[in-house]
């Protein structure tokens, strides 16, 4: 029976140093809570949620917990450069996740996390959500959490 090696074990066997974000790093938690005001947020409005440090591998365990919202409302969760504000991936963590009926949903279908991809930040990034499809309801609450691996 044949055995193959992961990218990390192959690199270690060849004498290369593997970064903590790829092997043996510390898992840390990202947490953001947002309570919308008395008015709605329009389609394409953004919510700045917080920062991830340089060298952070974004894990695939992100979730959003939310109170009842408007029918058809969805959000994207992405990241942009902290230094320049330039969007790196508008839906890198999650794309078109429904936040309508109160509940919880996974935020792991983003373009930087699916199809065998992973993402390690090359600079400090801002994590943000974009309102899609319908307005975010007045007084709606979102709690977003997920982990990343670093040092």
Regions found by a protein language model. Name each.
Residues 2-151:
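Surface-exposed, low-hydrophobicity beta-strand/loop segments enriched in small/polar/acidic residues
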